[in-house]
A protein has these predicted regions:
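Long, contiguous, secondary-structure-rich segments that constitute the structural scaffold
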Residues: 19, 28, 35, 39-149
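Long, low-complexity segments enriched in small/aliphatic residues
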Residues: 1-40
Length: 149
């Protein structure tokens, strides 16, 4: 249930909050089925994708002084997740109104109960959704990223 009595959203919104300057999205990975509840119990699949990671652009990695494999913390208005940085040209900054906007991406196949290291990316996502379908909004939300350690 996404709305309290009286129809007000129960979530914390963080649009244009300078503490969370980067756009984040979530996605699946080929190696783990959906949330990973079945595939994370298979050793050969865990060997391929053993832990939570966050894809970041080469440009953002330089800006934040991060290297591939560095431990990082991703935070939003709703929570924090620990992951490993995956510096990649797959994710690139884009321009909005002459401003550079960085985007990061996290898989949502990690969680609490099965093997594998990492928190669920859904700890960061808002619990709002379409009023008619109740489909949650997990594809665009604001985060910050910093080195751990």
């Amino acid at each position: 249930r996404m709305f309290s009595e009286g129809g007000l959203a129960e979530d914390v919104f963080a649009t244009c909050d300078t503490r969370y300057p980067y756009v984040a999205t979530t996605y699946r990975v080929t190696e783990h089925w959906q949330t990973g509840v079945l595939s994370r119990n298979m050793p050969w699949l865990m060997e391929l994708v053993p832990r939570q990671f966050v894809e970041i652009s080469v440009e953002l990695a330089k800006e934040k002084n991060l290297k591939n494999g560095d431990p990082v913390e991703i935070s939003s208005a709703r929570g924090k997740v620990e992951a490993v940085a995956m510096v990649t040209p797959r994710v690139r900054p884009f321009k909005v109104a002459n401003s550079t906007v960085h985007m990061v991406g996290l898989p949502w196949c990690f969680g609490w109960m099965t093997p594998g290291v990492g928190d669920s990316a859904n700890l960061l996502t808002p619990t709002v959704g379409d009023a008619n379908t109740m489909i949650p909004e997990t594809k665009a939300f604001m985060v910050n990223i910093k080195a751990r350690g």
